[in-house]
Amino acid sequence: MILDDESQILGIDEAGRGSVIGPLVIGGVLMKKKKIRFLNRIGVKDSKQLNMKKRTIISRKIKKIAQFKTIIIPAHTIDEKRNNDINLNEIETEGMEEIIKIMKPNACYIDCIDVRENRFHDKIQKINPNMTVVTEHKADETYKIVSAASIIAKVERDKQLEIIRQEYGSVGSGYPSDKNTINYLKTIKNNQFPPIIRKTWKTIENITKSTE
């Protein structure tokens, strides 16, 4: 498809993929091609390069100039699907497909979740054969529209994690690399893990073994 200034461009990225606590959030941002330059002006960059305060401020600015959509996939849903032999890439692709079908872009740029870019590209292309598809590793660093999606996803996950903290207390960042998260998991007695925890994660298996 030949893209012009009026073409609708969609960026997609996720937050919380590797987390053991909390949801996986997929974010989509849709803008006309001619308006993408405004993302530079409001300070859009990969969400990992921004602290929480800056992400929140920029997220509000993105929402004023673009259409956006978030898909929240709770921990217990991830577990249910994985227990039915649906892997994390497939779970995430389902969420991306939902965003694409809702937003109907002319072109879609995605931070590739597969080790093989071509294989992932073909999966996304099947969703809409008439759509231009770009799937690259580190697309969130290369394309501003994907950076914007990464900010939207990360801010929503931050919000979801805060809701979790209000109910369950200090859970850290939710990632296995966070000592505070591991310490929280170790306080859970008799392996009665609440639904905010991804029980199918290797982290939980290791903790369960260590407390036996």
UniProtKB/Swiss-Prot annotation:
GO terms for cellular component: cytoplasm; ribonuclease H2 complex. Its cofactor is Mn(2+); Mg(2+). A divalent metal cation binds at residues 13-14, 111. It is an enzyme of class 3 (hydrolase). It comes from the Archaea. Keywords: Cytoplasm, Endonuclease, Hydrolase, Manganese, Metal-binding, Nuclease. The keyword Nucleotide-binding does not apply. It is found in: Cytoplasm. It catalyses: Endonucleolytic cleavage to 5'-phosphomonoester. GO terms for molecular function: manganese ion binding; RNA binding; RNA-DNA hybrid ribonuclease activity. Manganese or magnesium. Binds 1 divalent metal ion per monomer in the absence of substrate. May bind a second metal ion after substrate binding. CDD domains: RNase_HII_archaea_like. Its EC number is 3.1.26.4. InterPro entries: RNase_H2_suA, RNase_HII/HIII, RNase_HII/HIII_dom, RNase_HII_arc, RNase_HII_hlx-loop-hlx_cap_dom, RNaseH-like_sf, RNaseH_sf. The keyword Nucleotidyltransferase does not apply. GO terms for biological process: DNA replication, removal of RNA primer; mismatch repair. Transmembrane segments: none annotated. Residues 7-212 form the RNase H type-2 domain. PANTHER family: RIBONUCLEASE, RIBONUCLEASE H2 SUBUNIT A. Endonuclease that specifically degrades the RNA of RNA-DNA hybrids. Belongs to the RNase HII family. This is Ribonuclease HII.
